[in-house]
Amino acid sequence: MLDQTNYTPRLKSLYASNVRAALKEQFSYKNDMQIPRLDKIVLNMGVGEAVKDTKKVKTAAEELSMIAGQKAVITHAKKSIAGFRVRELMPLGCKVTLRGDRMYEFLDRLITIALPRVRDFRGVKGNSFDGRGNYAMGLKEQFVFPEINFDKVDEVLGMDIIICTTAKTDAEAKALLKQFNMPFVS
């Protein structure tokens, strides 16, 4: 069994040993606190079929919990929208916010295992930054993660992945993610 007290995620130790120094040299920061770091990763799964069957949100939350290694929170509608047959407080999806060691573990699994399993994968878009150093991407199917059993999946669901950093600009955030071997196309 692993000794939990001495365990450090691979990307966290990579950040401490190599990434910080490379970013400090590349952007010539004067203070170590200026060096960008990962803040959190948010996984969001919207379930459109939840309007007809609210049980699908629970199965989506269970799958998202297995992927993240942390319990998912069910999200509810803020307002009623008659055109979409949505009532206020109706469950519509689920989300998980990862921080600390779980965040580094998830990013490692995403980059090394899940993204290469995506069909016709050539890399992720390099222009999906929000202008403040956060990166957003989407996956069309949840079974690119090894935690999901293909035979037990009722419905193919996609998810949004938002990687929040402390970087001030998109260039700094992209350099940080490139140091973690994020496979950008451009």
Curated annotation (Swiss-Prot):
UniProt keywords, alphabetically: Ribonucleoprotein, Ribosomal protein, RNA-binding, rRNA-binding, tRNA-binding
GO (cellular component) term, any one: ribosome
InterPro entries, per database record: Ribosomal_uL5 (IPR002132), Ribosomal_uL5_bac-type (IPR020930), Ribosomal_uL5_C (IPR031309), Ribosomal_uL5_CS (IPR020929), Ribosomal_uL5_dom_sf (IPR022803), Ribosomal_uL5_N (IPR031310)
GO molecular function annotation: rRNA binding; structural constituent of ribosome; tRNA binding
A Gene Ontology BP annotation from the UniProt entry: translation
Function, as annotated: This is one of the proteins that bind and probably mediate the attachment of the 5S RNA into the large ribosomal subunit, where it forms part of the central protuberance. In the 70S ribosome it contacts protein S13 of the 30S subunit (bridge B1b), connecting the 2 subunits; this bridge is implicated in subunit movement. Contacts the P site tRNA; the 5S rRNA and some of its associated proteins might help stabilize positioning of ribosome-bound tRNAs.
NCBIfam families associated with the record: PRK00010.1
Quaternary data: Part of the 50S ribosomal subunit; part of the 5S rRNA/L5/L18/L25 subcomplex. Contacts the 5S rRNA and the P site tRNA. Forms a bridge to the 30S subunit in the 70S ribosome.
Family affiliation: Belongs to the universal ribosomal protein uL5 family.
Name the UniProt record assigns to this protein: Large ribosomal subunit protein uL5
Protein's organism: Cereibacter sphaeroides (strain ATCC 17025 / ATH 2.4.3) (Rhodobacter sphaeroides)
Phylogenetic placement of the source organism: Bacteria, Pseudomonadati, Pseudomonadota, Alphaproteobacteria, Rhodobacterales
